[in-house]
């Protein structure tokens, strides 16, 4: 086998709470993470020459050693003394810099793909440990199972997520949001409303999507909306079109809404497409990285 093709899925946050800050600048968080069926395709091909090449359909990501997928391949090459090279091609569908872990998901796909391609026989836990060196979201993206994430996001407790037929409307406005600046703008002593994650987990367990939708809280949202009112406007469009609930994912700028039926989600999509290009109707998922082809 010298070629492998993988699906690399996006995530949304059903809640985000920030509990404090570490000495190294990372924050202690508690959040519920949910994979969705919006994915990039990552193709990995072995090369005879000992180098790492990155190519993509997107003009918005670096194609050199600054790309997280390059770093993922380099970590495995160095750790296991691999003398072969690889070409990594990313067919981008997940919006870039959107708060949906697109880059982390791509890195997770490279770790899983090279584990198979190079027959390293690493367990999922071993891959997650390596992935944590690349980013806090990478371990979650490897498995993709809905989880309560704690610590800096690396401590994962599997939970029951949204039913797989849940209709989700996604809108990524053409805005740049600095995650660092959002966290810097957070006043932890003045948070008016925090998520009740225990209650949210119970709502997920009982598949009460209405209660889930009404209980979603992202404490980063007000900081980002303070800089970009547009995010609030998108939420209002979703709610006007019968979303059960709408919230910003991650530090933004992506907004999502949960819908009881697909027809309402599609009507909301049509309205948002009048102003925004990156609008999708997708379902929730229980999967992370998925191998969808191995070739010699």
Curated annotation (Swiss-Prot):
Keyword annotations: ATP-binding, Isoprene biosynthesis, Kinase, Nucleotide-binding, Transferase
Domain of life: Bacteria
Pfam families: GHMP_kinases_C, GHMP_kinases_N
Pathway: Isoprenoid biosynthesis; isopentenyl diphosphate biosynthesis via DXP pathway; isopentenyl diphosphate from 1-deoxy-D-xylulose 5-phosphate: step 3/6
InterPro entries for the chain: GHMP_kinase_C_dom, GHMP_kinase_C_sf, GHMP_kinase_N_dom, IspE, Ribosomal_Su5_D2-typ_SF, Ribsml_uS5_D2-typ_fold_subgr
Major enzyme class: transferase
GO molecular function (one): ATP binding
Reactions catalysed according to its record: 4-CDP-2-C-methyl-D-erythritol + ATP = 4-CDP-2-C-methyl-D-erythritol 2-phosphate + ADP + H(+)
Residue numbers annotated as active site: 11, 137
Function recorded in the entry: Catalyzes the phosphorylation of the position 2 hydroxy group of 4-diphosphocytidyl-2C-methyl-D-erythritol.
UniProt xrefs under HAMAP family: IspE
Protein family (similarity comment): Belongs to the GHMP kinase family. IspE subfamily.
Protein name, UniProt field: 4-diphosphocytidyl-2-C-methyl-D-erythritol kinase
Lineage: Bacteria, Bacillati, Bacillota, Clostridia, Peptostreptococcales
Gene, per the UniProt record: ispE
């Amino acid at each position: 086998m010298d070629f492998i093709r993988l699906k690399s899925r996006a995530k949304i946050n059903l809640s985000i709470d920030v509990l404090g800050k570490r000495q190294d600048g990372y924050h202690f968080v508690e959040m519920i993470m949910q994979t969705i069926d919006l994915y990039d395709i990552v193709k990995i091909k072995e090369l005879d020459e000992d180098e790492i090449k990155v190519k993509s359909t997107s003009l918005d990501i670096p194609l050199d050693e600054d790309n997280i997928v390059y770093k993922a391949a380099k970590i495995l090459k160095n750790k296991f003394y691999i003398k072969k090279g690889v070409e990594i091609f990313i067919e981008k569908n997940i919006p870039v810099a959107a708060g949906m872990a697109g880059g982390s998901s791509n890195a997770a796909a490279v770790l899983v793909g090279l584990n198979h391609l190079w027959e390293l026989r690493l367990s999922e836990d071993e891959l997650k440990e390596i992935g944590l060196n690349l980013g806090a979201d990478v371990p979650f993206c490897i498995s993709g199972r809905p989880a309560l994430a704690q610590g800096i996001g690396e401590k994962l407790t599997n939970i029951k997520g949204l039913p797989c037929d849940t209709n989700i409307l996604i809108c990524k406005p053409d805005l740049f949001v600095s995650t660092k600046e959002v966290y810097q703008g957070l006043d932890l002593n003045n948070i008016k409303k925090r998520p009740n994650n225990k209650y949210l987990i119970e709502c997920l367990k009982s598949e009460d999507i209405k209660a889930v939708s009404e209980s979603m809280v992202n404490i980063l949202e007000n900081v980002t909306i303070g800089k970009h009112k547009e995010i609030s406007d998108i939420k209002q469009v979703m709610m006007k079109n019968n979303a059960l609930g709408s919230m910003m994912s991650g530090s933004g700028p992506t907004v999502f809404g949960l819908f009881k039926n697909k027809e309402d989600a599609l009507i909301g999509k049509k309205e948002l497409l009048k102003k925004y290009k990156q609008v999708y109707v997708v379902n929730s998922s229980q999967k992370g990285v998925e191998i969808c082809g191995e070739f010699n």
